[in-house]
């Protein structure tokens, strides 16, 4: 498989065409951004870490029957994935009060929820990726009610798998963001990535943060935090 011309470049990844009409080549970048791109920095090794962690987690999900776009890891920073039409919704699942939810509800960060909350955010940088209801989604016409139901069900299924998997590594899955795509056959599958960029991950005992909040809140060394997650997941750490 050959990497051809650049199709798209986002904050954290570059997407390239391949000679296969139904595959694209993903390259993870060393860039870190927060607050819708207002805070930016290049962090050497971050792309490798996100690629390695995403590979491990997508393989885990595939093992239990959850369909994803992941095909294979090509290098430390690259992977081959199925080409899909991305649904312009971020699906956020929350197990513990943190971040914007703490501010919105006036609840203390770290409060464990009795059951997960699933939220939808409309993917639009100009609008700041606003929180939307199912009624808003219908007005925006970005997903059908049936598709929204599938997204919710898949998010909750993935949540349970990841909660258990991270717990075995002594990590608490606080919340995380997923993106989904539609194949040419009309099937909804998991896309994008699952990494400390898209999850809040806390040590189960100390609540030490191993995610992008380290960068957002200037809490320490981002690379060391991501390396710790990779090490606990059984990957090869470069520390």
UniProtKB/Swiss-Prot annotation:
Enzymatic class: ligase
Gene: purC
Lineage of producing organism: Bacteria, Bacillati, Bacillota, Bacilli, Bacillales
EC number: 6.3.2.6
Keywords of this entry: ATP-binding, Ligase, Nucleotide-binding, Purine biosynthesis
Family: Belongs to the SAICAR synthetase family.
Protein's UniProt name: Phosphoribosylaminoimidazole-succinocarboxamide synthase
Gene3D superfamilies the UniProt entry points to: ATP-grasp fold, B domain, Phosphorylase Kinase, domain 1
Catalytically driven reaction(s): 5-amino-1-(5-phospho-D-ribosyl)imidazole-4-carboxylate + L-aspartate + ATP = (2S)-2-[5-amino-1-(5-phospho-beta-D-ribosyl)imidazole-4-carboxamido]succinate + ADP + phosphate + 2 H(+)
Pathway where it operates: Purine metabolism; IMP biosynthesis via de novo pathway; 5-amino-1-(5-phospho-D-ribosyl)imidazole-4-carboxamide from 5-amino-1-(5-phospho-D-ribosyl)imidazole-4-carboxylate: step 1/2
PANTHER family: MULTIFUNCTIONAL PROTEIN ADE2, SI:DKEY-6E2.2
Cited InterPro entries: SAICAR_synt/ADE2_N, SAICAR_synt_PurC, SAICAR_synth, SAICAR_synthetase, SAICAR_synthetase_CS
Keyword Ligase: yes
Annotated signal peptide: none
